């Protein structure tokens, strides 16, 4: 018990230290990326995606898959082509903030520590900061920032609830969670089957997820997949 209390205190102290120094770190990192970007050809969006693909290839692949699932769900909601394009962009950029998360934190072969989880939970805010530094549309910044909010208000970074969370962010959240469950094994968790992942989404409908988004998401799969 004493050792656990010491570890908890150490983690809390580390989190305070990280929080105190993180703003300066992020400002420097964003400025450096922006300076590099000004030397590259292409607009801010292209620069950020190239950086994500080069430095975080698994996150990039995940983002492309999330965009596919999100657009399919948007079609189920009756989105027109313009809104589908916006939704696809929001999905592709949803994890762009992980560019600023140290690679050692992203690739730990075990469950993250409380301090590492604290840093990971900052990535939506990092994404919004990057979008701002690179002059991406304000709507994209908002959708990037809120994809980890929860329907019941217990998410992050701002604890938004229900329809206060932008619909596109709610859609991306479901697609993001599904792909994270089925895509790959992790050292501390085996990949889910499609049926297992759908069952988990249904369990969390109305708490973590918008139940209408869950319904639309499931409807995008062929009937034979829904039964498996």
PLM features per residue range, with description:
Residues 1-9:
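N-terminal acidic, proline/glycine-rich, low-complexity intrinsically disordered segments
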Residues 8, 16-228:
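Histidine- and acidic-residue-rich, metal-dependent catalytic cores
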Residues 12:
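His/Asp/Glu-rich acidic catalytic environments and adjacent acidic regulatory segments
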């Amino acid at each position: 018990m004493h050792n656990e209390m010491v570890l908890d205190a150490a983690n809390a102290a580390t989190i305070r230290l990280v929080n105190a120094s993180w703003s300066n770190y992020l400002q420097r990192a964003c400025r450096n990326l922006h300076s590099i970007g000004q030397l590259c050809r292409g607009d801010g969006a292209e620069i950020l995606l190239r950086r994500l693909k080069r430095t975080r290839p698994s996150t990039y692949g995940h983002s492309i898959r999330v965009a596919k699932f999100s657009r399919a769900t948007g079609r189920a909601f009756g989105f027109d082509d313009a809104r589908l394009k916006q939704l696809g962009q929001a999905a592709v950029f949803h994890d762009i903030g992980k560019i600023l998360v140290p690679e050692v934190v992203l690739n730990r072969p075990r469950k993250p520590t409380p301090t590492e989880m604290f840093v990971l939970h900052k990535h939506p805010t990092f994404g919004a900061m990057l979008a701002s530094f690179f002059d991406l549309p304000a709507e994209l910044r908002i959708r990037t920032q809120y994809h980890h909010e929860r329907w019941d208000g217990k998410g992050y970074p701002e604890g938004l609830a229900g329809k206060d969370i932008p619909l596109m962010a709610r859609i991306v959240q479901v697609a993001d969670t599904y792909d994270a469950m089925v895509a790959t094994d992790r050292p501390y968790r085996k990949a889910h089957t499609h049926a297992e992942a759908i069952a988990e989404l249904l369990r969390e409908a109305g708490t973590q997820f918008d139940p209408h988004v869950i319904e639309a998401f499931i409807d995008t799969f062929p009937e034979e997949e829904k039964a498996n």
